[in-house]
Amino acid sequence: MTRTITVEGMTCEHCEQTVEEALSDVGGVESATADRESESATVEGDADDDELVAAVEDAGYEASA
C-alpha cells in the first residue's frame, strides 16, 4: 500500500534523508521517500499512519496523514 503524508520543515537534502530514515525505521515500511519541495513523504508498506506521523515528529518535523 502506498500512502503520502505531509511533512513541514524540510529545507535541504539532509532533512529529506532524516525523514526517510525515520520512516524506514517504522515497522511495516518497505520504502520511504521525502520531497522538501512538495512538503511530503511517500511510504510503501503496511505501517500505521499514526506511527508514521510520530516517527517524523520525533525526527523534528511537523507531519500529518
Short names for language-model regions:
Residues M1-A65:
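Acidic, polar-rich N-terminal leader regions of halophilic archaeal proteins
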